[in-house]
Design a protein with these regions (language model features):
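Short, acidic Ser/Thr/Gly-rich low-complexity loop/linker segments typical of extracellular
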Residues: 30-31, 41-54
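A short, solvent-exposed loop/turn motif at the edges and junctions
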Residues: 62-73
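Extracellular beta-sheet/turn segments enriched in Thr/Pro/Gly and aliphatic residues
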Residues: 74-90
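Substrate-binding cleft of secreted/luminal carbohydrate-active enzymes
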Residues: 307-319, 330-337, 343-344, 349-409
């Protein structure tokens, strides 16, 4: 028996090696507390001195810390003093149709990045219809023809171009709204009470978030984005439809909805751990002013527990007349952003909030055009409330360079 125990201990020591290090800010050398150090199986956190030890036999070790670029440990450098580069993400949305090296839109945006504060892009990888921007190795999606409308025929070269400019890359994955997946799998599509597939106003079907097959599908797609080198996975439509009278495979109540979204994110964190990517989730802007799940399965507290960043869509035009005591919230872009984020600081550190900002005409009230003043006021609010940055939503990905040049530059 003693020999067996000694042999077991010896095998464990041979199989698992301890790696220790210290994580500091690249510019200030200050220790980074609660950084997440992961191999494909386990994660540990750095202590108050930025120190950590991880027992692993793997050579790919990744570090994530809020407000920093992801970091991959290079064992060839034989260093234990690990310096992370801080980043305040300032991102533009890049539409599905422009996400390739030859589009005129991407060329203009890359020139803009060279000359402005913009340092990141949110890129459609799977859109609302279910189409993928490049042909992945995910055979289930390919069997549905998800790649047929792809606009990027050389994703490796595209990613290399972005990395050469030190652009922080965010892969947008539309999660449960997926016409292709739902129409090819009617057994787990969201149904109307009569049993037929429900489609919303744009004639798009959704898959049932309660069915784990919908989780596997979206996370498999996220893995494809992680494999080609994205820094972050952004899950959009990671919610239940905001509509009553639909049929699901489980009892549809707040407890079950919130639990289901949490389980999805836990699985995503587990499966994506080995790639070292951050996970962000998109939410309605009114999540900042609500304590319940608004019938869609999202609360600030529940998302903060499972995701790295939350991205409320704080479009001033999306708030009803009378919100914030303003007749027209769209005329007060600074106040809408600042007050909304301030209202959730007791539930999540503002450094883990990166809102979507409005870069389109007011559609709800005064039809006000959002030009440089409105854009800069929104950005100023994110700076004053100390968020992790911002993401600008222009549905067409058309942007003006001078909107993103600070006045003092």
């Amino acid at each position: 028996m003693k020999l067996i125990l000694i042999t077991t201990a010896l095998l464990q020591s041979l199989l698992f090696a301890s790696f220790s290090g210290n994580i500091v800010d690249k510019n200030t050398s200050a220790p980074i507390i609660n950084a997440i150090i992961s191999d494909s199986i386990i994660s540990v956190k750095s202590d108050e001195n930025g120190s950590f030890t991880i027992d692993t036999n793997e050579t790919n070790i990744h570090i994530k810390a809020y407000g920093y670029r992801p970091y991959k440990i290079n064992f060839e450098n034989n260093t234990t003093n690990l310096k992370l580069e801080s980043i305040t993400v300032k991102a533009l949305y890049l539409t599905f149709w422009a996400a390739n090296t030859t589009s005129k839109r991407i060329k203009k945006i890359l020139n803009m990045i060279d000359d402005t504060e913009v340092n990141a892009l949110v890129i459609d990888i799977k859109n609302e219809y279910g189409s993928t921007v490049f042909k992945t190795s995910f055979e289930q999606a390919n069997s549905y023809g998800a790649h047929k409308n792809r606009t990027n025929r050389d994703i490796e070269n595209f990613m290399q171009l972005l990395k050469s400019k030190n652009i922080y890359t965010i892969a947008r994955i539309v999660t449960f709204k997926d016409e292709l997946q739902a129409s090819n799998n009617p057994d787990y599509a969201i149904k109307k009470i009569d049993g037929t597939i429900w489609r919303n106003h744009d004639n798009m079907a959704w898959v049932d978030p309660y069915d784990v097959r919908s989780h596997e599908y979206a996370i498999s797609m996220a893995e494809e984005a992680a494999k080609v080198g994205f820094d972050e996975i952004n899950f959009d439509y990671i919610r239940f439809p905001a509509k009553a009278g639909l049929k699901f495979c489980e009892t549809n109540n707040q407890e079950n909805r919130v639990k289901t979204i949490g389980e999805f994110l836990d699985l995503a964190q587990s499966r994506l751990r080995k790639y070292g990517v951050f996970i962000s989730v998109d939410t309605y802007g009114n999540i900042c002013w609500s304590n319940d799940d608004n019938n869609i399965g999202q609360t600030v507290l529940s998302l903060a527990k499972h995701a790295d960043y939350i991205s409320p869509m704080l479009y001033p035009s999306g708030f009803a007349s009378g919100s914030f005591y303003f007749e027209y919230p769209s005329e007060h872009p600074y106040a809408v952003i600042y007050r909304s984020i301030k209202n959730i600081k007791d539930r999540i550190d503002s450094k883990r909030v990166r809102p979507w900002l409005q870069y389109f005409k007011d559609y709800a009230h005064t039809k006000r055009h959002y030009r440089k003043f409105e854009v800069r006021e929104q950005i100023r609010a994110t700076e004053d409330i100390n968020t992790s940055g911002w993401m600008m939503w222009s549905p067409s990905s058309r942007y003006h360079l001078n909107y993103f040049v600070k006045e003092d530059e």
